[in-house]
Amino acid sequence: MANSDVKPKSISRAKKWSEEIENLYRFQQAGYRDEIEYKQVKQVSMVDRWPETGYVKKLQRRDNTFYYYNKQRECDDKEVHKVKIYAY
């Protein structure tokens, strides 16, 4: 990214589950807003994803421990409202 200090302009909460919400849930579990912030902080160009589903497979937290995720959905319906959606 050209601008390494991208800040979100607005935030909203997820209302229903989707594949995008699933991936945001995984990034936020690992301590990041979204894929943009993860790539900025970890200085990586690609995120490990499951080829079958496209969901995030593995993330490295800020303390350098790893989170590993399943191929299937992990964000239950009761967790969806906790997911934050950032607009840039």
Swiss-Prot record:
Subunit: Interacts with PACRG.
Protein name per its UniProtKB record: Meiosis expressed gene 1 protein homolog
Keywords: Differentiation, Spermatogenesis
Lineage top rank: taxon: Eukaryota
Organism field: Bos taurus (Bovine)
Function, as annotated: Essential for spermiogenesis.
Gene Ontology cellular-component annotations: nucleus
Family: Belongs to the MEIG1 family.
Short name of one Pfam family: Meiosis_expr
GO biological process, one term: cell differentiation
